[in-house]
Design a protein with these regions (language model features):
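Conserved catalytic core of two-metal-ion nucleotidyltransferases
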Residues: 1-22
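Conserved nucleotidyltransferase catalytic core and NTase-mimicking acidic/glycine-rich helix/loop elements
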Residues: 30-144
Length: 144
């Protein structure tokens, strides 16, 4: 594996994949300590990925699954805002929401809405799209 993929695929293989047949590739990687570098490697593509979801959403009449997936991607990507001294990973969507609201209390309502969309997306696609785009802009600005 290229060294440039160590913090994305290496981390993913070591901590999130289970071998079901053949060689266990996880054994080729050390345990990774939680870090911003890993968060960037795993979530750094959040804006183009979400733009892809929004494009697909505009082309379908039943986008409930896409809305749910987009909301989850965005909420998990808030891990990009972690501090260097953070020494663990959020495990649940609720933990992601709680952590980002602790750091950005002014986003409490927006993050609460996003968490709700992770479980039961609203039917109004135009409203969903507008709010998701606003949160995408906020995340993009907050991580600079």
């Amino acid at each position: 594996m290229d060294s440039e993929n160590q913090f994305s695929w290496g981390y993913w293989l070591r901590h999130h994949c289970r071998c079901v047949a053949g060689e266990d590739l996880a054994s080729h990687f050390p345990r990774f300590a939680p870090s911003r570098e890993i968060a960037v490697a795993v979530n750094g593509d959040v804006i183009p990925v979400l733009q892809g979801y929004l494009q697909r959403l505009a082309e379908t009449s039943n986008g409930r699954g896409l809305k749910r997936a987009a909301a989850r991607k965005l909420l998990r990507a808030t891990n990009l805002l972690r501090h260097a001294e953070d020494n663990d990973w959020p495990e649940t969507l609720e933990e992601y929401a709680s952590r980002v609201v602790q750091r950005f209390p002014q986003q409490q309502l927006a993050i609460g809405w996003l968490l709700q969309q992770c479980h039961t997306p609203e039917d109004d696609t135009a409203h969903f799209t507008a709010r998701l785009k606003a949160l995408m802009r906020w995340l993009d600005e907050a991580r600079r």
